[in-house]
């Protein structure tokens, strides 16, 4: 079978905050898929970057008395440290504030402009007279023009849900200076999205999106596509629009181009062919993993920009839902707005990887991290089932058989049943239905433990050491099959299991033959149980984080 060439991206985390468990849902989802593709022998690259531009970055650095470059450098280092400990295996993690991104953004802009897809017009915006800067909607607060609710942002009311322009807000104030904004005219640059309506509809019909996403896009088409403002006025931290003084690319223009820039950096470092992956007639595969809150940008603007600049479009966009904790939106006051670092200070990252896999499917439903179920699921499935197979079998092999597996002929049909299940597990991984894959694997783990229970090696050892040798050797081989299937989800535990089994990296193809007359190493615990105390410590530490921020 010919190896596939695949490029995978995840949404870029913004460089003004820390990674939290909501972010990690997507990176773990994508990482599992990438690891699976590599196990299948496919050439698969996974790129990402910090999203570094925009008014919030400029203002935050100003508040801290440092340059934006210094701010984003420190944030990137922390982001990458968190990702590394959660085993997110990026081929390249870059920054949107890079020469590659600047060059590609300018190139795309010139192509769009030359083709007549960039328009200009004068617009009126809210302007802070004290800070001498135009204000994004989220930097203005006031009273809702419809229901009168206080302290509402400049784009929509969180109380009654109405949307409006900042100029309609009553008693409006700049959240930067507390000054009353004034209206000021400015020339802005627009991407003419409506020109691509026919092409976008055709692209969507080709099946690049989940059905739920396609249905949502149909609603937007019915409302009518609008030209997209791709410019912002100085002062602004970002890339200046070529040949236009005092105008910068809006962050949402150069952010998705950051996917291309990150891959370009990887290509330059490893001698890969960038054009092979992004030329209009490319035969490679391109997949974006994103959350449902940024579908509009990725399923309309982004493909249209690629079409207009003569690049290939995504093979598919994989959309996931939001993360809730204990059935509710993450809350700082309840201690359920959990940062990655807070989790890492108390719990094993592989536990979260498994729980997310147990919950994730190809649908865009929200995922709930129920902390009680999280503890019970990890303790039951990983510790009580999978690891238990190895731990309860190894002692006999160490004490009686010099840690060497038998050349057994006992119950070969059970081993082959485990191997045959690999086909359906592969299909579930490929389709991103990890929840179904985990359930299949745990059914097998139950069978392995049932097999040990039925043969009772602790009793057999008194009268039939040969059968004990065969039973425990088969159990170890069943454990090997399960860990091969779990490797995309649990890479660290899989590595430890490889060392215990004294083998090279787990490989689906190697499962055709069981290990016989093979010496293993001393067993060391692969996973510890989650205790209530640890979860309580995470919640309490998250509450403390809120107080520090406040």
Swiss-Prot record:
Output a single Gene Ontology CC term carried by this record: cytosol
Motif 'KMSKS' region per record, residues: 329-333
Write down the Pfam families for this protein, in alphabetical order: Anticodon_3, tRNA-synt_1g
Residue ranges of the motif 'HIGH' region = 13-23
Give the Enzyme Commission number. Answer: 6.1.1.10
Keyword ATP-binding in annotation:
yes
Q: Which GO terms describe its biological process?
A: methionyl-tRNA aminoacylation
The protein's UniProt keywords, in alphabetical order, are: Aminoacyl-tRNA synthetase, ATP-binding, Cytoplasm, Ligase, Metal-binding, Nucleotide-binding, Protein biosynthesis, Zinc
As cofactor, the record names:
Zn(2+)
Cellular location(s):
Cytoplasm
What is catalyzed by this enzyme?
tRNA(Met) + L-methionine + ATP = L-methionyl-tRNA(Met) + AMP + diphosphate
* Residues binding Zn(2+), per UniProt: 144, 147, 157, 160
Report residues binding ATP: 332
**Co-factor binding details:** Binds 1 zinc ion per subunit.
Q: Which function does this protein serve?
A: Is required not only for elongation of protein synthesis but also for the initiation of all mRNA translation through initiator tRNA(fMet) aminoacylation.
Q: What family classification does the UniProt entry report for this protein?
A: Belongs to the class-I aminoacyl-tRNA synthetase family. MetG type 1 subfamily.
Assembly with partners or alone: Monomer.
Protein name stated in the entry: Methionine--tRNA ligase
What species was this sequence derived from?
Ruthia magnifica subsp. Calyptogena magnifica
Quote the gene name from the UniProt entry: metG
């Amino acid at each position: 079978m010919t190896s596939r060439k695949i490029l995978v991206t995840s949404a870029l985390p913004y460089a003004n905050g820390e990674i939290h468990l909501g972010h990690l849902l997507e990176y773990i989802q994508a990482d599992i898929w990438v690891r699976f593709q590599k196990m299948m022998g496919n050439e698969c690259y996974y790129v990402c970057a910090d999203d570094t531009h925009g008014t919030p970055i400029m203002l935050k650095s100003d508040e801290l008395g440092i340059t934006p470059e210094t701010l984003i450098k420190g944030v990137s280092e922390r982001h990458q440290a968190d990702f590394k400990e959660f085993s997110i295996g990026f081929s390249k993690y870059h920054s949107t504030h890079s020469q590659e991104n600047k060059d590609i953004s300018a190139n795309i802009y010139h192509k769009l402009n030359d083709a007549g897809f960039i328009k200009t017009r004068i617009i009126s915006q809210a302007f802070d007279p004290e800070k001498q800067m135009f204000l994004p909607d989220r930097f203005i607060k006031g009273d809702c023009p419809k229901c009168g609710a206080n302290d509402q942002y400049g784009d929509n009311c969180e109380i009654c849900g109405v949307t409006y322009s900042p100029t309609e807000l009553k008693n409006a104030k700049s959240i930067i200076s507390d000054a009353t904004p004034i209206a000021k005219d400015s020339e802005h640059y627009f991407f003419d999205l409506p020109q691509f309506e026919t092409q976008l509809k055709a692209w969507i019909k080709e099946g690049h999106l989940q059905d739920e996403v396609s249905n949502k896009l149909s609603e937007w088409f019915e409302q009518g596509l609008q030209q997209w403002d791709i410019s912002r006025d100085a002062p602004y931290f970002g890339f200046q629009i070529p040949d236009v003084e005092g105008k910068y690319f809006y962050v949402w223009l150069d952010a998705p181009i950051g996917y291309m820039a990150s891959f370009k950096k990887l290509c330059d470092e490893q001698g890969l062919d960038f054009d092979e992956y992004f030329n209009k007639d490319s035969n490679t595969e391109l997949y974006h993993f994103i959350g449902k809150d940024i579908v509009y940008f990725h399923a309309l603007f982004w493909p249209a920009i690629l079409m207009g600049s003569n690049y290939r479009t995504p093979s598919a966009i994989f959309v996931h839902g939001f993360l809730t904790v204990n059935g509710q939106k993450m809350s700082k006051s309840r201690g359920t707005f959990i940062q990655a670092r807070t989790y890492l200070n108390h719990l094993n990252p592989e536990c979260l990887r498994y729980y997310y896999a147990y919950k994730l499917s190809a649908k865009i439903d929200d995922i709930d991290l129920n902390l009680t179920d999280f503890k019970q699921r990890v303790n039951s499935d990983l510790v009580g089932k999978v690891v238990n197979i190895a731990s309860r079998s190894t002692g006999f092999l160490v004490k009686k058989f010099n840690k060497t597996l038998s050349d057994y002929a006992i119950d070969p049909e059970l081993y082959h049943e485990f191997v045959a299940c690999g086909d359906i597990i592969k299909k579930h991984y490929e389709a991103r239905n990890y929840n179904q894959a985990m359930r299949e694997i745990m059914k097998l783990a139950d069978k392995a433990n049932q097999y040990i229970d039925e043969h009772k090696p602790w009793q057999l050892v008194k009268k039939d050491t040969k059968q004990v040798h065969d039973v425990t050797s088969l159990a170890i081989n069943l454990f090997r099959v399960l860990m091969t299937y779990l490797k995309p989800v649990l890479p660290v535990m899989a590595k430890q299991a490889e060392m215990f089994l004294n083998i090279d990296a787990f490989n689906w193809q190697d499962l055709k033959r069981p290990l016989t007359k093979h010496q293993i190493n001393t067993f060391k615990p692969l996973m510890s149980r989650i205790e209530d105390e640890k979860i309580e410590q995470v919640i309490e530490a998250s509450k403390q984080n809120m107080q520090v921020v406040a």
